[in-house]
Amino acid sequence: MMIIHKISELQSKLQVERQKGRTIGLVPTMGALHAGHASLVKRSVSDNDVTVVSIFLNPTQFNDKKDLERYPRTLEADCKLLEQCGAQIAFAPSVEEIYPEPDTRTFSYPPTDSVMEGAMRPGHFNGVCQIVSKLFSYTNPDRAYFGEKDYQQIAVIKRMVEDLGFKLTMVSCPVIREESGLAMSSRNTLLSDAERALAANIYAFLKKSTTLGLDVQQTHDYVVENIDAIEGLKVQYFSIVDGNTLAEIGSWQDAESIVGCITVFCGSKPIRLIDHIRYK
């Protein structure tokens, strides 16, 4: 596996591959890779001749500097995992390489990017679109792979792909969960064993809420009240939304696809965890 740090080197390498008629898959990551990322990489390896995995902790999508500072950085271990998964290229640029000057581009796709994470983390999705659009431009992939854990992020990037006319296929891959049901996340490494056990309640109550036959408001209240009742967990938001537009719904008949998206603070630090459940 090649480890590339420069955009020009990446583009030269991929140009050669493309001239040979090879297909290219891109898996954008921020590093601190786990089994969820590995599943995306393996899918790309099976679908494409060449798989590029970007490892870049993107500062423009963090509105909280402390969150950026404590995000795990594990490049050596990440590269070992990628090699085991069969990736051909790890692209690990510096911040200066990606942003030699401040990126002043603005992306706006309401309501998809203005609710939930967009409301709680102003500027977050603008930063996501900045970096992902750059990565798409550098690699010109046939396919790009994203994990469904970040459900809203996928919806926003789909809007951006349509808006900017990228000729690629977006591939959404299922959430990979720990045995407890907790969605795998790089942030899980920041949890103590006790906090990790607490966090398993998030998906447990989401899953249970699909079986109770409640209306939308009752379902919302059931999830929030039960999670908030556990010491060490605090719901920041739980939104039941149209699975395509992410607009909030009031009735199960309001949309063909319905998803519940949640963010919960866990533990004393606290660590912010996201998850979702499909209702319809």
Residue ranges and their predicted role:
Residues 2-232, 241, 245, 277:
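Nucleotidyltransferase catalytic core that binds NTPs
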Residues 222-280:
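Phosphate/ribose-recognition catalytic cores of enzymes acting on nucleotide-derived substrates
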